[in-house]
Amino acid sequence: MLCLCLYVPIAGEAQTEFQYFESKGLPTELKSIFKLSVFIPSQEFSTYRQWKQKIVQAGDKDLDGQLDFEEFVHYLQDHEKKLRLVFKSLDKKNDGRIDAQEIMQSLRDLGVKISEQQAEKILKSMDKNGTMTIDWNEWRDYHLLHPVENIPEIILYWKHSTIFDVGENLTVPDEFTVEERQTGMWWRHLVAGGGAGAVSRTCTAPLDRLKVLMQVHASRSNNMCIIGGFTQMIREGGAKSLWRGNGINVLKIAPESAIKFMAYEQMKRLVGSDQETLRIHERLVAGSLAGAIAQSSIYPMEVLKTRMALRKTGQYSGMLDCAKRILAKEGVAAFYKGYIPNMLGIIPYAGIDLAVYETLKNTWLQRYAVNSADPGVFVLLACGTISSTCGQLASYPLALVRTRMQAQASIEGAPEVTMSSLFKQILRTEGAFGLYRGLAPNFMKVIPAVSISYVVYENLKITLGVQSR
């Protein structure tokens, strides 16, 4: 009888032995998979129960809450294949061994920066013979009964632009794991993200419309506060007027997200290296180019959104009527007013948002990622809120100028202006503060927008058959 024994060291306790299962025979082709004793490092799983739960979740095919011999063997076979792929991706020199520099480079490619000392610490935990390199056998023995591959897990749990929608779709698109792309889960994530964005934008639409009104109409002579702005909107058009412009704002989510995703996949091939996952600067370049392509494609909808938000009661019967009147009165060029400041705003927004998010992600991973790369709800929401706020703060003057240019014809008698002349005019008449009109309601909507989009995203994932966190 062959008995597989698992020794699980628990910090502060004597080494405990657990007999997992017994079998009278083991197929010859599977003998290479097993070791009679497997040691699971205490820093990976602090308790046997936590370790067992992860193994059972990964291998339980019939969902009976238990792992029989056949399921366990299938889990080991499948997991070893995944480990082989990860090992090959880490082995940059193709010499059959992984050293500290290769670990640092692989994590750097994912945007996770660690020191050489940290890389050596990782090596020592797996290195059995003291060579400070890891061969395939050492890698397999260490990770075989660890149900998570850390590199894809980081991509899986730390999605950003797919989850969070604050109304400005200028963020760098998320990466998807190989498994997500092969199984078609990527489009489910995008659909869930689109639905979450629609609900989030609808819930925060009153604040978004107030922001647009303050960007266009507020000045030193017309000091518009938040309460006064809401009162003015309700007095002019009733409570329903708070949602003016929301229809087109929601409608543009689907085409923009689809174009952006497809463009990003193409840009990755142009700017990327041979690595499966892009480096941070490559992601920024590919994401910014994809964002520019998507924005160029749907920009007329951006102009319509601004005009619809600024309209007075009875001015337009709907979106199509608004578009027809703009076309008849101002021509096709009117649908691209503010295009240049909008394009220029992509780099600071996407760059700072990505940089801040990656910095916060790396800090958390280095300090707290022991058992899993899953940061939990509150950490993810906090990182998303902070990075989005920083990105908006950096690009806000350009966004304000874009909105004023889009709104030119909606203000009767307003002269035709360029981006540079509008900047000069604002600085001359209102000072630097004038470039940040409407910032308060814009920031007020970030936390509810992020929270609502996250909750809706998680629920839509379950509905669409995507495993929740």
From Swiss-Prot:
SUPFAM superfamilies: EF-hand, Mitochondrial carrier
Repeat in keyword set: yes
Known tissue expression: Mainly present in the liver and the skeletal muscle (at protein level).
Keyword list, A-Z: Antiport, Calcium, Membrane, Metal-binding, Mitochondrion, Mitochondrion inner membrane, Repeat, Transmembrane, Transmembrane helix, Transport
Residue intervals annotated with topology Mitochondrial matrix: 208-244, 302-337, 399-437
Residue stretches spanning the membrane: 190-207, 245-264, 288-301, 338-357, 381-398, 438-457
InterPro entries: EF-hand-dom_pair, EF_hand_dom, GDC-like, Mit_carrier, Mitochondrial_sb/sol_carrier, Mt_carrier_dom_sf
Annotated region described as C-terminal transmembrane transporter domain, given as residue ranges: 166-469
One Pfam family of this chain: EF-hand_8
Notes on how activity is controlled: Activated by an increase in cytosolic calcium levels that induce a conformational change of the N-terminal regulatory domain, uncapping the channel and allowing transport.
UniProt GO BP: adipose tissue development; ADP transport; ATP metabolic process; ATP transport; calcium ion transmembrane transport; camera-type eye development; cellular respiration; multicellular organism growth
Mitochondrial intermembrane topology ranges: 1-189, 265-287, 358-380, 458-469
Compartments (UniProt record): Mitochondrion inner membrane
Alphabetical list of PROSITE patterns matching this protein: EF_HAND_2, SOLCAR
Catalytic activity: Mg(2+)(out) + phosphate(in) + ATP(out) = Mg(2+)(in) + phosphate(out) + ATP(in)
Domain remarks: The regulatory N-terminal domain/NTD, binds calcium in the mitochondrial intermembrane space and regulates the antiporter activity of the transmembrane domain/TMD. In absence of calcium, the apo form of the N-terminal domain is intrinsically disordered and binds to the transmembrane domain, inhibiting the transporter activity. Binding of calcium leads to a major conformational change and abolishes the interaction with the transmembrane domain and the inhibition of the transporter activity. The C-terminal mitochondrial carrier domain/transmembrane domain/TMD bears the transmembrane transporter activity.
Protein name: Mitochondrial adenyl nucleotide antiporter SLC25A25
Record organism: Rattus norvegicus
